[in-house]
Amino acid sequence: MADNDNEDSIMDDLVEEYVETEEENFVDSEEESEDKDEIVESPSICEGFVQASSQTLVVIPDNERITSNVLTTFEATRLVAVRAQQLAINGSTMLKKKYSSPIDIAKQELFNRKIPLLVMRCIKVTPDGQKIVEIWNPREMGIPLLD
């Protein structure tokens, strides 16, 4: 139980670091954001998790991923929930339009591909304790419909 709490707190720290990076790189106008349609890779995020975790984390390179590039409903729901929680405690939004609730904002950020979170998919855990994972940016994934 303590390891799981530790990993959750580490992931929360990594998410906060990623949000800060994304907010610094956020472009206000949509015309400019279409011109700069590249994903900012931040290997330091992964390295921080590897160093802080009790398990060794092996990140599969982007060009060697084996899982689907479509978010599962669970992953999409989890992203919306985590982002809504951040927004509820005065997180800044990546949208110009005003919405009534943090959940609505989080859903729109996901559908507009502006959500500042990453998806980590565990592929397997080896007998020597290495955790093999893929890290996806939701901007490069298909998004399921959420009700």
Swiss-Prot record:
Localization terms from the record: Host cytoplasm; Virion
Query: Which InterPro entries did the record assign?
Result: DNA-dir_RNA_polK_14-18kDa_CS, Pol_omega/Rpo6/RPB6, RPB6/omega-like_sf, Rpo6/Rpb6
Using the UniProt record, give the first listed, main subcellular location. Answer: host cell
Q: From the UniProt record, which GO molecular function terms apply? A: DNA binding; DNA-directed RNA polymerase activity
Q: Where are the transmembrane segments?
A: none
- Write out the GO biological process terms: transcription by RNA polymerase I; transcription by RNA polymerase II; tRNA transcription by RNA polymerase III; viral transcription
- Taken from the record, one Pfam family name reads RNA_pol_Rpb6
Tell me if Transcription is a UniProt keyword of this record: yes
Keywords in alphabetical order, please: DNA-directed RNA polymerase, Host cytoplasm, Transcription, Viral transcription, Virion
Which parts of this chain are annotated as the region Disordered? 20-39
GO cellular component entries:
DNA-directed RNA polymerase complex; host cell cytoplasm; virion component
Indicate yes or no for the key word Transcription: yes
Positions of disulphide bridges? none
Which function does this protein serve? Component of the DNA-directed RNA polymerase (RNAP) that catalyzes the transcription in the cytoplasm of viral DNA into RNA using the four ribonucleoside triphosphates as substrates.
Q: How does it assemble?
A: Part of the viral DNA-directed RNA polymerase that consists of 8 polII-like subunits (RPB1, RPB2, RPB3, RPB5, RPB6, RPB7, RPB9, RPB10), a capping enzyme and a termination factor.
The record's comment on protein family reads:
Belongs to the archaeal RpoK/eukaryotic RPB6 RNA polymerase subunit family.
Write the protein's name.
DNA-directed RNA polymerase subunit 6 homolog
List the taxonomic lineage. Viruses, Varidnaviria, Bamfordvirae, Nucleocytoviricota, Pokkesviricetes
